[in-house]
């Protein structure tokens, strides 16, 4: 052995051998005289006792067959990436021709390699204590003792997906790098050839731990590493060289278990993945000089990490990822005290020291805190990956990064998008037993990767999904511009400026921002189904900590910057009957008679005085037997026994509370219609004339048709009031979700509408619309109306809306509403009604995320359209608008994007960029025909079909 090792330096030298000598049969020409080699064969054989030890042969070793005449082989003429097995003549003993590693001494067996490397590291560590260029914390670690780690060293075949699901992957795992390809022959010069000698490198100064971009190119780095460690001066480390897009990626790859667990490989859209549009953080080439040190850190985004040591050795100092240790890490990171007592290993309960050698791989779980010491020149392949096993620590670390103000470039790229895609993937891949609807049709258009081989989720995984639900619930509120953000535990959440609406809107998948609330509701129901128990969902009980804040804060002062206002205060995620029942039985719900629901509209700064709708009140409560029927056209329809909800513009129809005769004109009634109590009285009041109402200065093409009957023109107004309850729904909200159950607020905390007389034409008809004190005393039980469009499997009838004690109300309705909706006089009233057949009501346009903010407060303004003006308007635009309307609302023709899609009960249509959910119900007694209406003398009459 000793005589062989004397020639280590000779073996490392490059050898020039003529090509005609390659087939010779005299001596083995490797720069060593054949007599010396033959004398050393017996010593070599003593180290190779079994084929198991042969399999652990050191780096860059090539097995060859020895016969009576040894062939002359030059390692430089051997394909370094040829992985074909070499035939071994069993008649002779196996020997190894060693092309020694560039940065480490050659070794023959793993046992000897570990012992030699460890002894070499210890001898060097003694000298490093006096090394002037070592990092100060590196010197501290050399003087400390650490307990022996209990981490498992496993064979490669045992490291699989099932093992990590069973164990939870909560501890580091070390195993031989048997599934890596072509890495035994890689050295620094070959890596430089594959990635290019002109490739710029970002170096890390080990002493200062600061990254220096473009400090060297690859050619300069090769020259730097060729120097003796004592002659290099400052110590540099290469940690951020991502090589997944270089030729080196063909010769290195992630371990199989990493590919199986990586969420990017699974949930990221395959189309984008194939185009290379995905987070590139999974394949780094680390080239560390001797004495390199990486400070204690947690991987960005709480991601897990793998290190495959190609050549050399690394020492890991590992601290378990617990909440207590995270707090200690945060305190150490923000502390200015640099004493030994404030050194992180002294602030935690335990710190492990693990050595990883050549051709070994270590997996570090999410949330673990660790530092890395490189005792000798080392090349390794490393990467980061997110898993569904560690959703809780990943989200915790991501939030910690935001609190510490970590810059975006040092965070996990597209982290929030991956969380959205993860929820979509598992929701589609492992469906629950709920019925599918239009939201599912939209979600199903997202591409997902391969499926996990999972029969049932573990408790750790389901707890992670609950944490993911909480995170997405908060992000959905941000996308809806809520002033007050709460989590699913009803606790307020503080959102930093750099993580607000702009960030949420950028990271949400395409079109999901329009249905984010509905999807979060469905994902909560999905968790409940798979958890076999009720998950913690937000409920309407979360008003207690918001009530005082809303009262104390008062109206926000106007300033030059746009203020994001809330479209709703709280969203109820409860599609499970048990959760709805608990919400009904809660103590807060029992005190609803003293409270009202508040919905704050989005406000835009104004330089002019205009009426402000600061308070939008609704008196709905949730109920277990709730069903929502959605309109079968874009504008109008009628129903016989149901409440109809229009989620896109939040309009609804209360059957038997509106004149049935008017439905023949295809009216889409908004909740504001109910302000005028005269609308609920006898039909004989038709002589009283109401002017049309609309909303001026709006910038949206989403319109709603209103028609009149006789001299009576019905206009959208503000609310329907009874005692301390106001019912108001916003037809102009930009919220794409359907009506949600909102926070309870005392009525006296609601600011009344302010009406500027100078800006409003105060005719007798408009005066009716500005009466906030209007009461509908004839509807004593109207506050019992309930609505929950998000509950897809719930249903209710009109009788369920009314309590048993409201028989008088039923009698009043029967007196007011004709039993036959077609019983109305056709004559002069109908002719005049045709003259008022069109009226556009507009919706607020969603504000863009650009810096240019409107400087005008856009609120609904009441205005009068005289008879002659409306007549001229009708003559010009009626035919064109009606034809366009019917072309977009035909039940048999789908949108241009989906003209090849056949839909039976549910279909998703694209309107512009947004998708609208339209459900068809067989109980509709009026609907549009499949062709445009016939033009008659007095205008256009919308014919109904299916009337009964």
Curated annotation (Swiss-Prot):
Can you supply one Gene Ontology CC term for this chain's record?
A: heterochromatin
Molecular-function annotations in GO: histone demethylase activity; histone H3K36me/H3K36me2 demethylase activity; histone H3K9 demethylase activity; metal ion binding; transcription coregulator activity
- The entry marks the following residues as binding substrate, namely 294, 314
Q: Which residues form the JmjC domain?
A: 243-402
Class in the EC hierarchy, top level? oxidoreductase
Give one Pfam family.
Answer: JmjC
Task: Provide this UniProt record's keywords sorted from A to Z.
Answer: Chromatin regulator, Dioxygenase, Iron, Metal-binding, Nucleus, Oxidoreductase, Transcription, Transcription regulation
Which locations, inside or outside the cell, does it occupy?
Answer: Nucleus
Q: What is the effect of changing residue 307 to A?
A: Loss of function
* Required co-factors: Fe(2+)
Q: Where does Fe cation bind?
A: 297, 299
Gene3D superfamilies linked to this entry: Cupin (2.60.120.650)
Query: Which terms under GO biological process does the entry name?
Result: chromatin remodeling; heterochromatin boundary formation; regulation of regulatory ncRNA-mediated heterochromatin formation; regulation of siRNA-independent facultative heterochromatin formation; regulation of transcription by RNA polymerase II
- Tell me the InterPro entries matching this sequence: JHD, JHDM1_Histone_Demethylase, JmjC_dom
Reaction equations catalysed: N(6),N(6)-dimethyl-L-lysyl(36)-[histone H3] + 2 2-oxoglutarate + 2 O2 = L-lysyl(36)-[histone H3] + 2 formaldehyde + 2 succinate + 2 CO2
Bound cofactor: record note: Binds 1 Fe(2+) ion per subunit.
Q: What's its EC?
A: 1.14.11.27
Q: Does the keyword Transcription apply?
A: yes
The family this protein is said to belong to: Belongs to the JHDM1 histone demethylase family.
Domain writeup? The JmjC domain mediates the demethylation activity.
Q: What functional role does this protein have?
A: May be a histone demethylase that specifically demethylates 'Lys-36' of histone H3, thereby playing a central role in histone code. Represses transcriptional silencing by negatively affecting heterochromatin stability.
Protein's name in the database: Putative JmjC domain-containing histone demethylation protein 1
Please name the source species. Answer: Schizosaccharomyces pombe (strain 972 / ATCC 24843)
Gene behind this chain?
A: jhd1
């Amino acid at each position: 052995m000793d005589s062989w090792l004397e020639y280590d330096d000779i073996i490392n030298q490059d050898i020039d051998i003529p090509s005609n000598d390659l087939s010779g049969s005299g001596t083995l020409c490797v720069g060593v005289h054949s007599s010396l080699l033959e004398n050393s064969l017996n010593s070599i054989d003593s180290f190779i006792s079994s084929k198991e030890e042969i399999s652990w042969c050191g780096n860059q070793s090539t097995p060859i067959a020895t016969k009576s005449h040894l062939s002359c082989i030059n390692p430089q003429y051997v394909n370094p990436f040829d992985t074909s097995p070499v035939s071994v003549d069993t008649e002779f003993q196996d020997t190894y021709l060693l092309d020694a590693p560039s940065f480490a001494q050659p070794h023959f067996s793993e046992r000897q390699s570990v012992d030699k490397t460890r002894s070499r590291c210890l001898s060097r560590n003694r000298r490093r204590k006096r090394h002037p260029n070592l990092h100060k914390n590196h010197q501290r670690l050399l003087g400390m003792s650490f307990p022996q780690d209990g981490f498992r060293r496993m064979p490669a075949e045992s490291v699989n997906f099932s093992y990590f699901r069973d164990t939870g992957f909560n501890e580091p795992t070390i195993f031989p790098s048997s599934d890596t390809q072509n890495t035994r022959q890689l050295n620094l010069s070959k890596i430089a050839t594959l990635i290019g000698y002109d490739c710029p490198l970002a170096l890390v100064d080990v002493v200062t731990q600061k990254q220096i971009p473009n400090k060297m190119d690859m050619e300069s780095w090769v020259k730097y590493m060729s120097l003796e460690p004592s002659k290099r001066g400052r110590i540099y480390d290469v940690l951020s060289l991502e090589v997944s897009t270089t030729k080196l990626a063909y010769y290195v790859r992630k371990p199989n278990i990493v590919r199986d667990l990586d969420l990017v490989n699974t949930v990221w859209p395959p189309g984008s993945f194939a185009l290379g549009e995905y987070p590139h953080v999974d394949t780094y080439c680390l080239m560390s000089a001797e004495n390199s040190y990486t400070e204690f850190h947690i991987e960005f985004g709480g991601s897990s990490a793998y290190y495959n040591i190609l050549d050399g050795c690394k020492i890991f100092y590992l601290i378990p990822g617990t909440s207590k240790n995270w707090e200690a890490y945060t305190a150490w990171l923000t502390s200015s005290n640099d004493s030994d007592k404030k050194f992180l290993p002294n602030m935690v309960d335990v710190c492990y020291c693990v050595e990883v050698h050549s051709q070994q791989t270590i997996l570090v779980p999410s949330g673990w805190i660790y530092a890395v010491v490189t005792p000798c020149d080392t090349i390794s392949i490393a990467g980061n990956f997110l898993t569904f096993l560690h959703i809780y620590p990943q989200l915790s670390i991501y939030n910690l990064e935001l609190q510490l103000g970590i810059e975006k470039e040092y965070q996990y790229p597209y982290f929030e998008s991956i969380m959205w895609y993860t929820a979509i993937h598992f929701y589609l891949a492992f469906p629950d037993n709920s019925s599918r609807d239009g939201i599912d049709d939209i979600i199903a258009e997202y591409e997902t990767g391969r499926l996990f081989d999972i029969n049932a989720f573990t408790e750790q995984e389901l707890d992670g999904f609950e944490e993911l639900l909480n995170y997405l619930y908060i992000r959905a509120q941000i996308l809806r511009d809520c002033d007050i953000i709460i989590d699913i535990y009803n606790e307020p959440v503080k959102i930093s400026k750099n993580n607000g609406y702009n960030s949420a809107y950028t990271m949400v998948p395409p079109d999901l921002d329009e249905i984010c609330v509905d999807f979060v509701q469905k994902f909560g129901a999905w968790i409940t189904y798979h958890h076999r128990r009720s998950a913690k969902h937000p409920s309407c009980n979360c008003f207690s900590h918001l009530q005082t804040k809303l009262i104390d804060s008062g109206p926000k002062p106007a300033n030059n910057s746009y203020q994001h206002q809330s479209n709703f205060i709280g969203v109820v995620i409860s599609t499970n009957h048990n959760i709805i029942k608990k919400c009904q039985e809660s103590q807060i719900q029992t005190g609803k008679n003293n409270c009202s629901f508040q919905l704050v509209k989005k406000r835009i700064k104004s330089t002019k005085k205009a009426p402000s709708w600061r308070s939008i009140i609704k008196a709905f409560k949730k109920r277990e037997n709730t069903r929502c029927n959605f309109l079968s056209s874009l504008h109008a329809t009628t129903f016989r026994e149901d409440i109809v909800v229009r989620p896109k513009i939040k309009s609804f129809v209360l059957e038997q509370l509106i004149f049935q005769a008017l439905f023949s004109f295809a009216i889409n009634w908004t909740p504001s219609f109910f302000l005028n109590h005269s609308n609920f009285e006898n039909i004989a009041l038709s002589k009283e004339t109401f002017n049309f109402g609309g909303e001026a200065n709006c910038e949206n093409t989403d319109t709603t048709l209103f028609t009149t009957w006789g001299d009576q023109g019905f206009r959208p107004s503000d609310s329907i009031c009874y005692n301390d309850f106001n019912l108001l729904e916003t037809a102009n909200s930009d919220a794409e979700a359907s009506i949600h159950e909102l926070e309870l607020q005392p009525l006296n905390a609601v600011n009344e509408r302010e009406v500027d007389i100078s800006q409003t034409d105060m005719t007798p008809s408009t005066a009716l619309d500005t009466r906030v004190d209007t009461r509908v005393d004839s509807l004593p039980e109207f506050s019992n109306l309930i609505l929950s469009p998000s509950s897809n499997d719930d249903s209710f009838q009109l009788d369920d809306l009314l309590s048993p004690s409201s028989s008088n109300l039923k009698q009043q309705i029967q007196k007011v509403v004709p039993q036959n909706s077609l019983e109305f006089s056709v004559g002069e009233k109908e002719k005049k009604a045709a003259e008022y057949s069109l009226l556009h009501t507009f919706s607020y346009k969603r504000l863009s995320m650009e810096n240019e903010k409107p400087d005008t407060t856009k609120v609904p303004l009441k205005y009068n359209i005289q008879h002659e003006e409306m007549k001229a308007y009708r003559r010009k635009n009626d035919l064109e608008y009606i034809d366009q309307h019917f072309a977009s609302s035909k039940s048999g023709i789908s949108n241009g994007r989906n003209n090849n899609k056949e839909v039976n009960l549910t279909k998703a249509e694209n309107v512009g960029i947004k998708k609208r959910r339209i459900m068809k119900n067989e109980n509709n007694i009026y609907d549009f025909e499949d062709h445009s209406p016939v033009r008659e003398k007095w205008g256009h009459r919308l014919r109904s079909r299916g009337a009964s």
